[in-house]
Amino acid sequence: MSETPIWPPRWPRAHGGPLAAGDFRATPEDFVVEEVFDFAPEGQGEHLWLWIEKRDLTTPEAAKRVARACGVRPRDVGYSGLKDRVAVTRQWLSVHLPGREAPAELTATLATSGIAILDARRHPRKLKRGVHRLNRFTLRLTGDIAEHPGLSRQWQTLCEAGVPNYFGPQRFGREGRNLIMARSAFARGWRKRDDPHGMQLSAARSFLFNEVLAARLRTDCWRTPRDGDVLALAGSASRFVTETVDATLLDRARRGDVAPTGPLWGKGRQESGAEVAALEADIMATHAALSQGLEAAGARMDRRPLCLRLETPALRLDEEGGVVVSFGLPRGAFATAVLRELMQHPVL
C-alpha cells in the first residue's frame, strides 16, 4: 500500500545536517544560473539563436514572449533546459526564421518584459531539449549561514565527497502538489492530455528515486557500490552492472570515476541485481500506486547517479556580508541538493 508522506519528506542529509538558517533567493539576483554548452551556433542557417538573460520569468513564458515578438508559433522556439523563475538566468533560445531577419525592434520589445538579448547567431538546426552539458550556478547566501564559523569546512567536505543527487522541491510543486496530482491521475488512469508536459510523471519518478537514495543514505552506501549496483561512468551516459564489488571498484567510486545509480521508474527491465534490486523492489512495493501507475502510463525505465559531484566549486565573501558560492552541475541536477547540505530553509 502506498503511503501519503509528510511534506516535505524528511529525506536524510549526508554530511551532518545543515549548519544554520539562511536565505538564497532574497532577490532574483541572488540566484544566477547559466547554461554551458560544448558547441556554439555556426553563424548561418534557418534558426536564429538568441543568448538571453531573463529575470523573474520561467523559460516557457520567456519562449512565448520571444515567439510573439518574432511573429512565429510557440513551437518554432526551442530551448535546452527549464530554468528557475525567481532567478537571473542565461540560456540559448532558437527561433525558426527561414529567409528573414528578426524584427528590428526585437531587443527593445523583449527588454520591456524582463528579457535581455546578449548575443544572436544563426544555426542550421533548432535547439533541442537537454543538449547543454551543465548549469553553472552563482548563489548568494544570506542570514546566519553567512557568518557560521564551520561554513568553509562544510563546503570543502561537499566539494571533496559530493552530495546526494536528490530531485529538488521544484519538481514536486508547492506542498507536493504535482505528486498529489500524480496519485489522483494514476488512480483514475493517467492520460497525456491531462498532463501534456509530463509534470505528474516526473514528480512520481523523482519521488521514488529520492526514496531509494534516502534508503541508501540511511545505510551509508549512497556512494559505495554494492553487489548488483548499476554504476554510471563520470562524464558520460555509459553504465554497467557489477555482480561483485572489489577493491578496484571501491577505489574508483572514492575518486568519483564511477557512481551507483538509482531507478527512474517505469516500464522496462530493472537493470540492477542482487541486494540492490531487492531494496529497489521493496520501495516500489511500498509505493505501489506510484510505481505501477508509472508503468501503466508508459514511462520508460532509466537510471540516475545517486552521488552528485560539483564542478569547479568556489566560495567567497562579498562586500555586503553575504557568502557567494559557485559551482557547475550536470543538467537535471538541482542546486538545492547542494544547499540543503549547508543550510536550513523552508523549501530545503
Swiss-Prot record:
Q: Top enzyme class of this protein?
A: isomerase
Q: GO: which molecular function terms?
A: RNA binding; tRNA pseudouridine(13) synthase activity
Catalytically driven reaction(s): uridine(13) in tRNA = pseudouridine(13) in tRNA
- Highest taxon, organism lineage: Bacteria
Output the SUPFAM superfamilies linked to this UniProt entry: Pseudouridine synthase
- Pull one GO CC term from this UniProt entry: cytosol
Instruction: Read off the Gene3D superfamilies from this record.
Output: TruD, catalytic domain, TruD, insertion domain
Keyword Transferase listed? The answer is no
Question: Any S-S bridges, and between which cysteines?
Answer: none
Q: Which residues are responsible for catalysis?
A: 84 (nucleophile)
**Span of domain TRUD:** 162-308
Transmembrane keyword on record = no
E.C. number: 5.4.99.27
**What does the record list as GO biological process?**
tRNA pseudouridine synthesis
The record's similarity note reads: Belongs to the pseudouridine synthase TruD family.
Outline what the protein does: Responsible for synthesis of pseudouridine from uracil-13 in transfer RNAs.
Q: Any idea what this protein is called? A: tRNA pseudouridine synthase D
